[in-house]
From Swiss-Prot:
The gene is flh-1. It comes from Caenorhabditis elegans. This is FLYWCH transcription factor 1. Disruption phenotype: Knockout, in a flh-2 mutant background, causes poor coordination, egg-laying defects and dumpy appearance. Causes a ninefold to 10-fold decrease in lin-14 level in embryos and about 2-fold increase in the levels of micro-RNAs lin-4 and mir-241. Despite the increase in lin-4 expression, post-embryonic heterochronic defects are not observed. RNAi-mediated knockdown causes precocious embryonic expression of micro-RNA lin-4, exacerbated by simultaneous RNAi-mediated knockdown of flh-2. One of its GO terms (biological process) is negative regulation of DNA-templated transcription. It comes from the Eukaryota. PANTHER family: FLYWCH TRANSCRIPTION FACTOR 1, FLYWCH ZINC FINGER TRANSCRIPTION FACTOR HOMOLOG. GO terms for molecular function: DNA-binding transcription factor activity; sequence-specific DNA binding; zinc ion binding. Probable transcription factor. Binds to the DNA sequence motif 5'-[AG]GGCGCCG-3' in the promoters of target genes, including micro-RNA genes, in order to repress expression, and acting redundantly with flh-2. Transmembrane segments: none annotated. A zinc finger (FLYWCH-type) spans 135-192. InterPro entries: FLYWCH-type_ZF, Znf_FLYWCH.
Amino acid sequence: MYSPESMNSNISSPSPPSSSSLNAPSLADAPEVRSDDGEAETSEPSTSVTAVPMEIVSQASTSAPVNQLLASGIDMSSVIKNNAVLQALLASASAGGFGDNAGLTMSKLLTAALANGSTAVAKRDAGSPRTDIPKKTRLKVFSNGFFMTFDKLSSCQKKYFWRCEYKNTCKARMHTDIVTEKILTFIHEHNHSAPIDEEVRLYGLDPTNIERNRVYIVGNVADPNQRRKIRKQVADREAAAKRLVQQQEEEQQKQQSASSIVAARAAYAQAMQNGSIPTSSGVASFLQSTSATAPMTSHSMLLAQMPFLNNIKTEMSNMVKNEQFTPERYTQHMSPNLPLQTATIAPLIIPTENYDSPSYRQPAIKRKATDLTNEEHDLRRDPMFQPTFELARKLRKLWKGEPNRYPRTTTTPTHHFEFFLSKNDGTDEHLYVPMRINLRDEAHLKEALQDFCGQQCIGMLLFGISPKISVMFNQPMLNNWDNNQFFLLDISNPSRWRLMYVDDQAV
């Protein structure tokens, strides 16, 4: 029987060929050699062995691979037929191309054929039919109007995870219970339209008898080409409907614009015939009556046809802001009716008024004083000036020096301590108030700070060196500080107040 161990022992390298001729053995004790037909040849025994003829070695080396090939069941004719190298070697061996080493060469060839025989036989002929391996497919189900494919089993081994059949573009997911087969969770919504009834019928389902929140196993029995055709037809119909709606909207917009232009021109022509320019209320009522079926949509086009409406609108808005708008006053100061001077004048008549006349003098416009302290009128937040202030703030940060963390000290301190104080409200600018304490100690300083804030400090009073570093007040610290310096008081934490120094020379 064939085994890897027997093959390795039988194909060991044989002894080198001797220079003697290939005659019958003449040794006294020649070994027994079994040929292919099963007969045993025995020579006379001898006391010494000097050499082994090549014929005996070749027969012994060749018989083992042959027996292994026969036992393995490999069709040698197919191996030789499908291997051009073996055919060439056999032709060379039959012609005597190997010389005295023909047995050794054939043994190696048979051993190689035994090692690669299964591969050679497994090769498909050019004329033989192709046997394709079935493609691995996923289970498909239909639920709530969409097709889902199996994704994986949950880690708890209690749920099935399903994903949309268009997994590359749609994130919809579904979880079902393994035992009850009920839908547990829906994750995300489908970003595409649901399949039509024709697609559902391809999978053997009746769209009229499908229950909601139920999973129907459909498999992959539908014709993919047929479904692609259906999907393409649906996509073409949706695209055509979308184009039709867009064309209808464009046509409707054109009609509305045209009707607005016609109405504006009619109003302007009527005003020119009457010899006066109508008021804004008259124009609006006329336009509303002439274009009731097609409302105006383009205000810029209307103002282009009737420029005086823009001036009327601006004048009315200014008067409303100044709280001076009344119907009587507005009609009193309207432009007077001017007759047409000549027939060659341009269609658009701009009325002229005599501003020197007292009857035509416009009322003085009263404006409210702008409160610069009001946050609503802060110029720093104005869109026009904000970039300038931002640039100035950045330049100021670049030009100013590094601020000091500690107040300036003096060698001749006074008994009293004068300083400027402000609350830290988080803004960039602060209003400082002058303060004075008669004695330089923590008690008097704390009392002055409480009077300034109107609150009681229930905790400690600290001196802030940085946003994260604070130290407690001590007497030598207060004794060496110079007068007329600036400080910020932070009372956001009632348990500890922080007094921080502001370097006025670096600001």
